[in-house]
């Protein structure tokens, strides 16, 4: 997720940092059981990362369908046209109320299984957020050697996936790392809340470069290889994804994937993040340039590396700078952009599109797709087409 510090500023203020546990979500009723398999064979998946849902529920937030009927969030995603769910997992988020630990992930994965939806597990290999700006080493792994840390990564991967397997969950996809644009398992200086501290030039301050793609490319590849092998040990048929941001950036993909392939690391699929809003904000690109560039890159990466590609994160502007729902005109533009991404990516041979945290309130995250009172906006209609 691009620049997570900025996009989550509303969430920190709204939810606070008081201690609690996710046990209340574990006790919630699961959605009404339909059947425990995917209902139809498809070669294209429409999905969402709704990892925040149990935390939102613990705060009393409810969700409603277009008719105004209260509906469990996972079931609502299916009603909106989705057939898959993506779930992030953190190593030890005890300082952040244990959301997205393996037990919390299991709660959400069970709901998806009950509804016949496919599941993607997204390993961050950190105790909290991992993205291009930071990939902080878990506290319990700090001070370990490279070889020890490879074992840490493999053991964590197998532990989480074995829990899924023991509970009848078979993930179709597993991400080994989240937006590992600059590698994985490298740390930056942070404040007490866990947010990165930047220098006078706006750059993060790297304190440990163990798996940094520029400083230690071989070790980045080694970590990915360890994760790949760990996934296959538990789920041999799972599709292992390497996930990078800025799907329009061909040079980035060649550089990063080149590090992996030249060092013997394998992957089954390339996952891309595609955010027209962030591309305009940080790279000066129009939405058309961003989307067109990504479609071309999907075809190029697939052909060059002989693998499938999926857009595992996207999102459209849903909130203004005050955290209020944007106008109907802006929502309509978001709908058109998303509909185009879904249509053109499918035509390009892409295997699916996942929206990142669409269920979020405008006051919580500006690129969600729901209203403040938990109803899908016009943006979500793109998944029904």
Pin down the residues of each PLM region.
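Bacterial Sec-dependent N-terminal signal peptides
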Residues: 3, 13-39
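Boundary/entry segment of secreted carbohydrate-active catalytic domains
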Residues: 36-76
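Hydrophobic faces of well-ordered beta-strands that scaffold small-molecule active sites
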Residues: 45-50, 85-87, 119-123, 172-176, ...
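Acidic-and-aromatic substrate-binding clefts and catalytic sites of carbohydrate-active enzymes
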Residues: 56-57, 61-68, 91-103, 181-184, ...
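Aromatic-rich peripheral "rim/lid" segments of glycoside hydrolase catalytic domains that contact
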Residues: 58-62, 129, 191-205, 300, ...
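Short, acidic/polar
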Residues: 60-78, 153-163, 249-262, 335-341
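Glycoside hydrolase catalytic-domain groove-lining segments
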Residues: 71-74, 233-243, 247-323, 340-347
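Substrate-binding cleft and catalytic face of glycoside hydrolase catalytic domains
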Residues: 75-198, 204-216, 220-239, 245, ...
């Amino acid at each position: 997720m691009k620049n997570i510090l900025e996009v989550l500023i509303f969430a920190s203020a709204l939810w606070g940092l008081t201690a609690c546990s996710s046990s209340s979500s574990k006790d919630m009723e699961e959605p009404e059981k339909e059947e425990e398999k995917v209902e139809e064979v498809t070669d294209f998946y429409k999905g969402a990362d709704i990892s925040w849902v149990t935390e939102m529920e613990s705060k009393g937030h409810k969700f409603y369908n277009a008719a105004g009927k209260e509906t469990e969030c996972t079931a609502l995603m299916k009603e909106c046209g989705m057939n898959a769910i993506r779930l992030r997992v953190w190593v030890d988020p005890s300082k952040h109320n244990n959301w997205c630990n393996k037990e919390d992930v299991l709660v959400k994965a069970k709901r998806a299984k009950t509804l016949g939806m496919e599941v993607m597990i997204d390993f961050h290999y950190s105790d909290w957020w991992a993205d291009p700006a930071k990939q902080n080493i878990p506290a319990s792994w700090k001070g370990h050697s490279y070889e020890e840390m490879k074992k840490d990564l493999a053991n964590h991967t197998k532990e989480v996936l074995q829990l899924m397997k023991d509970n009848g969950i078979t993930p179709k996809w597993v991400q080994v790392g989240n937006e590992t644009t600059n590698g994985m398992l490298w740390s930056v200086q942070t404040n007490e809340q866990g947010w990165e501290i930047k220098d006078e030039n706006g750059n993060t301050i790297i304190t440990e470069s163990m798996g940094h793609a520029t400083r230690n490319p071989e070790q980045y590849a080694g970590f990915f290889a360890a994760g790949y092998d760990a996934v296959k040990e538990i789920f041999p048929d799972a599709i292992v994804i390497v996930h990078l941001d800025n799907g329009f950036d061909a040079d980035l993909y060649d550089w990063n994937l080149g590090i992996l392939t030249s060092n013997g690391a394998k992957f089954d699929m390339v996952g891309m993040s595609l955010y027209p809003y962030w591309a305009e904000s940080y790279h000066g690109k129009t939405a058309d340039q961003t989307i067109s560039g990504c479609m071309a890159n999907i075809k190029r990466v697939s052909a060059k590396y002989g693998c499938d590609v999926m857009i595992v994160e996207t999102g459209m502007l849903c909130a203004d700078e005050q955290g209020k729902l944007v106008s109907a005109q802006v929502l309509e533009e978001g709908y058109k952009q998303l509909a185009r991404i879904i249509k053109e990516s499918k035509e390009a041979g892409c295997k699916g599109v996942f929206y990142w945290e669409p269920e979020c309130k405008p006051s919580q995250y500006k690129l969600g797709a729901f209203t403040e009172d938990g109803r899908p906006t016009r943006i979500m209609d793109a998944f029904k087409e």
